Amino acid sequence: DEDLKQLGEVVVTGHREYRSDRSAVETVKNAGNVLNVMSQQSIQLSPDVNVASVLQRVSGVTMERDASGEASYAILRGMDKRYNYTLVNGVKIPSPDDKNRYIPLNIFPSDLMDRLVVSKSLTADMEGDAAGGVVDMVMKDAPSRFQIQANAAIGASDYFWKEGRDYLTSNRSDYTKKAPYEAFGPEYKAQMNDFKNGPVQLNRHFAPAPNFIGGLSIGNRFWGDRLGVMLAGSVQNTFRGTERTYNSVKMASGEQAMYISNLHHRFYSIHDLTTGAHAKFDLTLPGHKLEWYNMYVRTNS
């Protein structure tokens, strides 16, 4: 037939949607090692506001909590937090603590995540300090077409209403933000006027202000889909209360028995303000792909 033409080759190119639950299941199924993947779809449906809270839902992962009771460090397969490391988009990041190399995961807002990948087995392509495992935070990528997403939530903790306790605050100006050693160097001799005068004044409130959580992301592709741009931001302003019991134990003189010498039951009023922003640009060229990524995270507690 004159209308028929012989085709030598047909190439069909598709793009995988990594942020869906189906993609997460396929990634785990086809992985060469033991993986757990939390997709963006699952993260958005959960009430978790940071990466540490999201990891609590992953099997084989235990979270170490700080003094206020908030999840902070990941313990993979029962091994201490120093036996695993953290990646952002596949790149190892340093710790904000100058004495340790493990990362507090409660400083990363979950709104910025595209997916969360937890590797529980050491393979040849990993570094030697991944004996426990690896946590890879994959941030949002530019979509195939223009997309804008926004979310906002408001709520309140019933801890203070239910327990009948006041929410305590203080004036930040009453605190000395930096020690003289940090402000003036190790050779400086501290003076009395380098410190604030008087005790910190506590203010009592019937209840804290409402909690607010909000996020916004905008992405699109330009220049014939070769240039991708993704901008995202997140704000989390939360108030909560907690309590802990501390005790000191001593050995009774002349007896093989121990007793509690001091017992303290403390109540905490906590205000956490976490802000985060990230920008990602990618340029696709024939045979190459260039990516530039930057993230800003700040937590004030």
Feature annotation, model-predicted:
Residues 85-87, 115, 147-151, 228-230, ...:
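Residue-level detector of the transmembrane beta-barrel scaffold of outer-membrane proteins
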Residues 35, 52-92, 115, 120, ...:
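Extracytoplasmic beta-strand/coil segments of soluble accessory domains associated
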Residues 17, 81, 93, 155-159, ...:
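Structural signature of outer-membrane beta-barrel domains
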Residues 145-221:
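Short strand-turn segments of transmembrane beta-barrel domains in outer membranes
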Residues 46, 50, 71, 103, ...:
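Transmembrane beta-barrel architecture of outer-membrane proteins
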Residues 195-301:
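Transmembrane beta-barrel wall of Gram-negative outer-membrane proteins
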Residues 1-44, 69, 81:
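Short, acidic, small-residue-rich periplasmic hinge/interaction motif at the N-terminus
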